Regions:
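Beta-propeller domains
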Residues: 1-26
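A short loop-to-beta-strand structural motif that recurs across blades of beta-propeller domains
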Residues: 9-13, 56-59, 119-123, 171-173
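Short loop/turn segments that connect beta-strands within the blades of beta-propeller domains
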Residues: 8, 43, 54, 63-64, ...
């Protein structure tokens, strides 16, 4: 209907348990919203949003849509082109920042997958300070072609680990909690 590029509408919609519409917000993520996670912090729940394409950001929000913090490319990681933290152009390069999803750490920090950009996994502390990165572009152990999603495996009876989906390689790669490569599981057609 001629509105394909319209970006002035919400991207997050809230419904109650009876499927009744409650509210909508998040227009700032329209055209690039990708990953969204809910995290319990004390007595409150928060939304963590990863947005790629021209949006190129990640944010923490209240369940009513108030921004707690909003961040762009972690330039201190050394993996991004100069100016990537202010760019709004769609760049599908390994020096671009195109985040896809989060995984949460017990210390209040989190991991962020740059699944369409540098293919790095970034670790942030509870105050949203960049701590470290692992992964990156490649075909070998510990490298990715589309580090799309991630999860912290804390199942009972197992040593905690970080599991990263690599969609282009159809694999799950497993890392210890310091981001050191452990093993690859193949053949998933992810």
């Amino acid at each position: 209907e001629g509105h394909a590029d319209k970006k002035d509408h919400p991207s997050i919609f809230v419904f109650d348990s009876e499927r009744k519409f409650i509210r909508a917000f998040g227009a700032q993520f329209q055209g690039g919203g990708h990953g969204i996670e809910v995290r319990q912090e004390g007595r409150e729940e928060f939304l963590y949003v990863a947005a790629y394409q021209q949006v190129k950001c990640f944010a923490k929000m209240t369940l009513t849509g108030e921004i707690v913090w909003f961040r762009k490319a972690p330039m201190e990681s050394g993996v991004y082109a100069p100016g990537e933290d202010t760019s709004t152009s769609k760049t599908w390069t390994r020096q671009g920042f195109l985040p896809t999803n989060f995984a949460f750490l017990d210390d209040g920090g989190f991991l962020l997958a740059d699944g369409y950009g540098s293919f790095h996994i970034h670790r942030f502390d509870k105050d949203v300070n960049w701590v470290s990165s692992f992964g990156g572009d490649g075909d070998g152990k510990g490298k990715f072609k589309t580090a799309h999603g991630l999860w912290v495996d804390k199942r009972p009876g197992r040593t905690p680990s970080i599991v990263v989906t690599d969609r282009a390689h159809n694999t799950l790669q497993i890392f210890n909690m310091d981001g050191e490569y452990q093993e690859t599981l193949e053949g998933f057609g992810l």
